[in-house]
């Protein structure tokens, strides 16, 4: 779900490659095919709601909903491009 040009909420079961392509990102995982799995890999534990991951590309991923051992929703905030002249 698109909130604006920089903010999205996606299902944890969403395909990682599809999310990356759709948002123009470079999220990759050797072991997982979903955005939820990607978050698990980065955190190395089952996250709680509102846990945050910052990627090397300065993309913020916040866990929006967890059900038992599954990430249900992930909030994604893309970095805004730097203003020219700053």
Where are each of the predicted segments found?
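Cytosolic regulatory modules rich in charged/polar residues
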Residues: 1-86
């Amino acid at each position: 779900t698109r909130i604006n040009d920089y903010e999205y909420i996606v299902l944890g079961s969403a395909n990682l490659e599809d999310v990356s392509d759709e948002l123009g990102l470079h999220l990759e995982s050797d072991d997982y095919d979903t955005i939820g799995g990607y978050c698990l890999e980065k955190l190395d534990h089952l996250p709680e709601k509102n846990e945050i991951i910052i990627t090397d590309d300065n993309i913020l991923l916040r866990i929006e909903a967890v059900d038992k051992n599954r990430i249900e929703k992930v909030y994604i905030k893309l970095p805004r491009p730097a203003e020219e002249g700053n």
